[in-house]
């Protein structure tokens, strides 16, 4: 009787052991795939990015001086979803992607300043005060940064509305969180941050105020270029003698993306579609005003969600920064800039592709199914199938 009980216990033990082994294998595979796709893949992608090299020696006559280099990151169109649009899973997935991408970039690349070129939120143009507060809280969690790293944000049409939707309340609400700063100088470099939604030129109150601010900035920049102590400039502190970098959401006027190229440019079928002024790009008049007032050496913009490089007047380069979110692009990226008071160099850093991550997950699911069926004996292994075929041939 005792022998029968021992045999019965052994008979139950082996299936239990097989099930435990299967469960451990499944957990190990799931953990490994999640670890790679949700954490390690960002390190693998961003580790390949390097700060571009820039000349750091400036010459004033025959004297040479060493210029400091500012390491700046430029990203655009994060479009954090609000309470109305987008499925909760869509919101969770895309916001996690952006959070991991930024936190990994901050840790690996150690930038000194991060600029976001508008459309931080997707529903800022109509969100309630409660929804706005929730969106801001999520943004601050996702885009947290060390105290020595500065974060600068310009307004986009999804943050404060298109021109016909924009009002003082929305603008002040945005500027209360992200500052109303128009001119930012660091390491001898001037950055001008423009509310391009307010550059409609129709004389609206917000537009007139924005233009007046830019005229004042233009005056200060001109004073920095003139001889020190000029009567026209007054006794106030002068800006560094450096042509500014213009940062805004809308691109300066261009007819279309027909001359844009690259993996992250607009799809070929969309490149020849004409742009609408004050909707897709700034108007000709507003663009000419900005170029005349500010005389920038470099322009960076967002809005189109795709990359493009154009030259205005044959001398002022503008780079449209692609969207940072998987929701707008399969291959998001950001721009890295090494900038000095007299020179700059830019390079692009690509984030993991969403389709690659999905393929890895699909492959993992297929592997788990095969592994489970194999353990349950419902799927013969290739080795056993080969042995059976050999036996059949020998018997013939």
Curated annotation (Swiss-Prot):
Lineage: Eukaryota, Metazoa, Chordata, Craniata, Vertebrata
Textual note on the cofactor: Binds 2 manganese ions per subunit.
Protein name per its UniProtKB record: Metallophosphoesterase 1
Membrane-spanning parts: 27-47, 356-376
Binding site for a divalent metal cation 2: 77, 119, 249, 305
SUPFAM superfamilies: Metallo-dependent phosphatases
Species the sequence originates in: Macaca fascicularis (Crab-eating macaque)
InterPro entries xref list: Calcineurin-like_PHP_ApaH (IPR004843), Metallo-depent_PP-like (IPR029052), MPP_MPPE1 (IPR039541), PGAP5/Cdc1/Ted1 (IPR033308)
UniProt-annotated binding residues for a divalent metal cation 1: 119, 157, 249, 303
Protein origin, superkingdom: Eukaryota
Name of the coding gene: MPPE1
Motif (Di-lysine motif): 392-396
Described purpose of this protein according to its UniProt entry: Metallophosphoesterase that catalyzes the removal of a side-chain ethanolamine-phosphate (EtNP) from the second mannose of the GPI-anchor protein intermediate. Participates in the glycan remodeling steps of GPI-anchor maturation to allow an efficient transport of GPI-anchor proteins from the endoplasmic reticulum to the Golgi.
Cofactor dependency: Mn(2+)
Alphabetical list of Pfam families matching this protein: Metallophos
MF GO annotations: GPI-mannose ethanolamine phosphate phosphodiesterase activity; manganese ion binding
Entry similarity comment: Belongs to the metallophosphoesterase superfamily. MPPE1 family.
Subunit details: Interacts with GPI-anchor proteins (via the GPI portion). Interacts with TMED10.
Subcellular location: Endoplasmic reticulum-Golgi intermediate compartment membrane
Record keywords, A-Z: ER-Golgi transport, GPI-anchor biosynthesis, Hydrolase, Manganese, Membrane, Metal-binding, Transmembrane, Transmembrane helix, Transport
Domain remark from Swiss-Prot or TrEMBL: The di-lysine motif (KxKxx) acts as an endoplasmic reticulum retrieval signal.
């Amino acid at each position: 009787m005792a022998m029968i009980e021992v045999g019965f216990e052994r008979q139950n033990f082996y299936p239990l052991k097989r099930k435990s082994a299967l469960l451990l294998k499944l957990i190990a595979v799931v953990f490994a795939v999640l670890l790679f796709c949700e954490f390690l893949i960002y390190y693998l992608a961003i580790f390949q990015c390097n700060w571009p090299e820039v000349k750091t020696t400036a010459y004033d006559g025959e004297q040479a001086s060493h210029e400091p280099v500012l390491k700046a990151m430029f990203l655009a169109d994060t479009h954090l979803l609000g309470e109305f649009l987008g499925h909760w899973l869509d919101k969770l997935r895309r916001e996690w992607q952006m959070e991991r991408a930024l936190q990994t970039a901050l840790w690996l690349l150690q930038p000194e300043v991060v600029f976001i070129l508008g459309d931080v939120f997707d529903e800022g143009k109509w969100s309630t005060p409660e929804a706005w507060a929730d969106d801001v809280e999520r943004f601050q969690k996702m885009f947290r940064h060390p105290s020595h790293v500065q974060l600068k944000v310009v307004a986009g049409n999804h943050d404060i509305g298109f021109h016909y939707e924009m009002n003082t309340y929305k603008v002040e609400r945005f500027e209360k969180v992200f500052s109303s700063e128009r001119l930012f100088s660091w390491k001898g470099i001037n950055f001008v941050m423009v509310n391009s939604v307010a550059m409609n030129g129709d004389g609206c109150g917000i537009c007139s105020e924005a233009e007046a601010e830019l005229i004042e900035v233009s005056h200060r920049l001109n004073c920095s270029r003139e001889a020190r102590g000029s009567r026209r400039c007054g006794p106030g502190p002068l800006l560094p003698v450096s042509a500014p970098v213009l940062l805004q959401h809308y691109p300066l006027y261009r007819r279309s993306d027909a001359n844009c190229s690259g993996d992250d440019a607009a799809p070929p079928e969309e490149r020849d579609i004409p742009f609408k002024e004050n909707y897709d790009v700034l108007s000709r008049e507003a663009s000419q005003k900005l170029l005349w007032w500010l005389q920038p050496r470099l322009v960076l913009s967002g809005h189109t969600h795709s990359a493009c490089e154009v030259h205005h007047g044959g001398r002022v380069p503008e780079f449209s920064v692609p969207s940072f979110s998987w929701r707008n692009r399969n291959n998001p990226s950001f721009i890295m800039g090494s900038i000095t008071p007299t020179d700059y160099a830019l390079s692009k850093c690509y984030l993991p592709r969403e389709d690659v991550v999905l393929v890895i997950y699909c492959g993992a699911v297929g592997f788990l199914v095969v592994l489970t069926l194999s353990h349950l004996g419902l799927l013969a292994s290739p080795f056993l199938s080969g042995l059976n075929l050999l036996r059949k041939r020998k018997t013939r």
